[in-house]
Amino acid sequence: MDRCGAYLDTMRSTAPLVQCITNFVAMNVMANVLLAAGASPAMVHDAEESGEFAAIAQVLTINLGTPSPRWVEGMEAAARGAVAAGRPWVLDPVAVGATAFRRGLGARLLALKPTVIRGNASEILALAGAEARGKGADSADTVAAAEAAAQRLAEGSGAVVAVTGPVDFVTDGRRGIRCGNGHALMPKVTALGCSLTGIVGAFAAGQPAFEATAAGLAFFGLAGEEAARRAAGPGSFQVAFLDALHAMTPDDLDRGAKLEAA
């Protein structure tokens, strides 16, 4: 894929308002990641306003991380509001296969037609109805093992599906692309995966979902590579990562993106 940097340039020039319904652990990290990248986060999750706000925001992201009945109402109201307003929305099916409650919630949200689904291999397998071996929010399956399920899920749902791991896989059911950017320190910082969903959302606001998702993954992973060069461990990595997101230029992304057709 050519010119990933153009997607970064467009995202920053529009500074999209990203409505984030995420978990308690991720809120601060996700907001700072989006701000550093050039987007505008809004952590609006209550059912009293989430649906109305989804029509104001340029994009919605929903994370299943810490669901409760009231938050679930907010998720469903926001998804309905985004669809009604013609806004893209991104589903992050955290630990969707872990419990019956999460499986049911995942199925209901899937029926509300997300634009993009971003999860690890075990989450994508579970959401697609295949056998998965997830450990809570962590994956026990490989990205390669989930590629066929991701294609089926994309075909059946109409969403772009991104399976993230050491090498990411993105598909719209017809096309596939792999992203090799990233660093081993990234999974050592909590909520970076959740924050990646926000970045995918920011890139997908007003841009073609398949290409924007791939560009967002490359941007995020390349920032991880840059941060790792300066970091001594997970603590300093977290700070360096925000700086790398902020400092990256479109030309940097064009030079450093590791994308290839699958």
Swiss-Prot record:
GO terms for molecular function: ATP binding; hydroxyethylthiazole kinase activity; magnesium ion binding. ATP binds at residues 118, 164. Substrate binds at residues 43, 191. GO terms for biological process: thiamine biosynthetic process; thiamine diphosphate biosynthetic process. It comes from the Bacteria. Keywords: ATP-binding, Kinase, Magnesium, Metal-binding, Nucleotide-binding, Thiamine biosynthesis, Transferase. Its cofactor is Mg(2+). Its EC number is 2.7.1.50. Gene3D superfamilies: 3.40.1190.20. SUPFAM superfamilies: Ribokinase-like. InterPro entries: Hyethyz_kinase (IPR000417), Ribokinase-like (IPR029056). It catalyses: 5-(2-hydroxyethyl)-4-methylthiazole + ATP = 4-methyl-5-(2-phosphooxyethyl)-thiazole + ADP + H(+). Pathway: Cofactor biosynthesis; thiamine diphosphate biosynthesis; 4-methyl-5-(2-phosphoethyl)-thiazole from 5-(2-hydroxyethyl)-4-methylthiazole: step 1/1. Belongs to the Thz kinase family. HAMAP family: Thz_kinase. Catalyzes the phosphorylation of the hydroxyl group of 4-methyl-5-beta-hydroxyethylthiazole (THZ). This is Hydroxyethylthiazole kinase.
